[in-house]
Amino acid sequence: RLQAECGFDLSALYVHHSLQAEADDWLVFCESYCASLNVPFRFEYVQVARSGKGLEAAARQARYQAYERSGAEVIALAHHQNDQSETFMLAALRGGGLRALAAMPQWRTFGENQQIWRPLLTVSRDELQRYADEQGLSYIEDPSNADNSLLRNWLRNEALPLWRDRVPQLDQQLSAGIQLLQQQLAVLDEVAEADAAWLEEAGYFDCGRWRTLSPAKQKQQLYHLARRKHLGVPSAVSVADFQRVLQHISPGTQAEWQLPAGKIYAYQNRLFALREDWLADCFWLNPQKMTGEDACLKETVATGSIKLCWHKLGLREDVLEQKPVIRAVTTDDIIELTAGHKKVRKLLQECKIPPFARPHWPVIVDVNNRCIAVANIWVSPSHACLGGWLPVFEQFNLFILEPK
């Protein structure tokens, strides 16, 4: 009914975690129920990789990755007021900060262009139960909710009922407090955004400017950067450790901050935030992704992520028709300069490319394994012409701090 009234397409996604024997039955139930409502339905199996996380956190991560892959503009979730109370209490028991204590917002940006919507946060579980019973709706009880060895379940089944006996309006009071926290958090986020815009005014995270901030704002900006770049939530200890490193690091030294979903590197007074999959498009690092041996450079580039860009001194057309190889630089690679030759690793160092990026830098070598071009930077004069073509991997441009 709402689809016709509001003009949107509704579909349902069941995420199968393969954690419970009943999961297949739940899939059948959801599929049948959606069919009765003429709502398109699909399901997705996910692997729950704990990798240091608790079971609940690992399952949540796998589930949200499935939501992101769905391509839906808005993902509607059924968290209710009691869930909100549990989330707040969990955050408090785990020593969470303001963002954790602010629990679940009704709306939040998710992924690149998606929104998470929780329309039932002001509705209690009892109200939902009464509605389902009155309307004769079928529903499923998850048996794992009875497992009080999980902290959330213990709160739900043991602790919070006692609090509700003492404070009958507990959930409403917590909800009101959470809304105030969310308002205060929104103001802090506005301040953080303004500071971030100033720090990155030159197009990169300026550590020199960052050092002029108060210690509290310095930490806030590190949290903010990790969140903006979708690198996961760092612990307070790791933020404090990296803050100390940045206070004293020399420009030519590289520092690394390991995060749940990637890394942040410091080099030459800049920060570089990288997801775990930042090398995914570097086809030259994976021989299986390379074009066949008979392909010329033009064909290899056409099927990969490297582009040919016009350059004042670039590769000649006849070189593009040959069959050179694109691969990662090695310690033995040497490139011809206008006068003499130079080790490619030295050239990368002179361009102030961060050490973490240098081993992955693409070079083009001829059939004799001689380097004829360094992507984004230089072309051997004996293979070049005025107004030729420079192989460019655009993702790596941000690493060239001192262009040739």
Which sequence ranges carry the predicted segments?
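Short coil/loop linkers at secondary-structure junctions
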Residues: 9, 40, 138, 169, ...
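Core alpha/beta nucleotide-donor-binding catalytic domains of modification enzymes
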Residues: 1-161, 190
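AMP-forming adenylation/ATP pyrophosphatase catalytic core
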Residues: 3, 15, 46-48, 62, ...
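Conserved anion/nucleotide-ligand pocket segment
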Residues: 156-174
